[in-house]
């Protein structure tokens, strides 16, 4: 079978080295004669895995000692409700910065639990761009300020951290977590579904500052209560052990290849290579301002929906999978998360050049 490159927005590709290791020990994990999927989540070997996974994650992401890591379920959508249930306090309201589909969806869910103010920070003119990120003059009115630093659908990324003064900043990093080095101390809570850069779907990572745990409203279900999950080591219920195991392999692999310093350089090169070609092309166009172009999700169009559909069909046949844009926006989208290689990007560009030659209007 010829090589296939998977540009899916999520669940996304996982490092081949990680998948190979998982395959090698699938039915005989740690020479126990059983799969990791078959052992007790509270047994000696799995608890050692959990401890090592957290240690590796903390090292790779440089997580401060006064932050806890929780491995939960429910995806980012679950956190859309969990955040207000745990963080709304005396001020009784939160501020949501709307940069696109997912930040708007988070705000809509949060309104079921609290008073939510929403400010649009994206301009959709000839080019899509992020506006002012200084909210220090109003942030202290709110229990927290929420934003999504990478919008997968539109391919918009916010590289600067919003200025919220001393307010609690909450970030949905589902699509750019572990893609570059960040200062975690600037955030109160970071959360992310696993299925883009952490591992397979099923695990939701929450990184939360210690002082923000223990303030949940009394009717919060125990499974969504950060304090309960902290005290139970994220095991108030039986966790998705295989997903946790694969995440542990990803963290270890990131360490082995040099950490986020290396990953950040690789990601920047992949994205720049693809954007440079799109900008030089006479057929394709990206509508996001250069300073806000996503490193993870590269969107592009031909300007002709029928030609877009033809591109998707022919690229799929050529072994370039999942390039169809989100139904909300259309066009094409190449998701080039951590596990995507430079070779994959070069293969995509090679196909794009061929398609342009064959389909550019005369």
Curated annotation (Swiss-Prot):
Task: Quote the catalytic activity from the record.
Answer: O-phospho-L-serine + 2-oxoglutarate = 3-phosphooxypyruvate + L-glutamate; 4-(phosphooxy)-L-threonine + 2-oxoglutarate = (R)-3-hydroxy-2-oxo-4-phosphooxybutanoate + L-glutamate
Presence of the UniProt keyword Cytoplasm in the record: yes
Q: Does the keyword 4Fe-4S apply?
A: no
Name a GO molecular-function annotation.
O-phospho-L-serine:2-oxoglutarate aminotransferase activity
Q: Name one GO cellular component term.
A: cytoplasm
Cofactor binding notes: Binds 1 pyridoxal phosphate per subunit.
Q: Which pathway does UniProt place it in?
A: Amino-acid biosynthesis; L-serine biosynthesis; L-serine from 3-phospho-D-glycerate: step 2/3; Cofactor biosynthesis; pyridoxine 5'-phosphate biosynthesis; pyridoxine 5'-phosphate from D-erythrose 4-phosphate: step 3/5
Matching NCBIfam families: PRK05355.1, serC_1
Name the PANTHER family on file.
PHOSPHOSERINE AMINOTRANSFERASE
UniProt protein name: Phosphoserine aminotransferase
The species this protein was found in:
Haemophilus influenzae (strain ATCC 51907 / DSM 11121 / KW20 / Rd)
């Amino acid at each position: 079978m010829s090589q296939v490159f998977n540009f899916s927005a999520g669940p996304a590709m996982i490092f081949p080295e990680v998948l190979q290791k998982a395959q090698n020990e699938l039915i005989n994990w740690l020479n126990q004669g059983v799969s990791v999927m078959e052992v007790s989540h509270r047994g000696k070997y799995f608890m050692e895995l959990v401890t090592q996974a957290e240690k590796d994650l903390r090292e790779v992401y440089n997580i401060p000692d006064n932050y806890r890591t929780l491995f939960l379920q429910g995806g980012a959508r679950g956190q859309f409700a969990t955040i207000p249930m745990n963080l709304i306090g005396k001020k009784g309201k939160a501020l949501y910065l709307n940069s696109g589909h997912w930040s708007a969806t988070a705000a809509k869910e949060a309104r079921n639990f609290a008073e939510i103010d929403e400010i649009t920070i994206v301009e959709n003119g000839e080019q899509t761009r992020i506006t002012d990120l200084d909210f220090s003059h109003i942030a202290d009115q709110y229990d927290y300020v929420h934003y999504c630093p990478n919008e997968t659908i539109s391919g918009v990324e916010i590289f600067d951290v919003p200025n919220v003064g001393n307010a609690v900043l909450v970030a949905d990093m589902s699509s750019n977590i572990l893609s570059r080095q960040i200062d975690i101390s600037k955030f109160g809570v970071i959360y992310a579904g696993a299925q883009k850069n952490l591992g397979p779907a099923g695990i939701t990572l929450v990184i939360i500052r210690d002082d923000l745990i223990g303030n949940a409203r009394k009717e919060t279900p125990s499974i969504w209560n950060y304090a309960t999950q902290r005290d139970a080591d994220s095991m108030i219920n039986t966790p998705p052990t295989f997903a946790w195991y694969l995440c542990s392999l990803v963290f270890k692999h990131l360490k082995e290849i040099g950490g986020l310093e290396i990953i950040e350089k690789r990601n920047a090169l992949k994205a720049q290579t693809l954007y440079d070609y799109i900008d030089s092309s006479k057929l394709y166009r990206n509508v996001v301002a250069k300073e806000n172009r996503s490193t993870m999700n590269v969107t592009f169009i031909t300007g002709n929906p029928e030609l877009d559909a033809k591109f998707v069909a022919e690229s799929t046949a050529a072994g370039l999978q999942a390039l169809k844009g989100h139904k909300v926006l259309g066009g094409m989208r190449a998701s080039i998360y951590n596990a995507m290689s430079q070779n994959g990007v070069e293969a995509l560009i090679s196909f794009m050049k061929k398609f342009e030659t064959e389909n550019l209007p005369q």
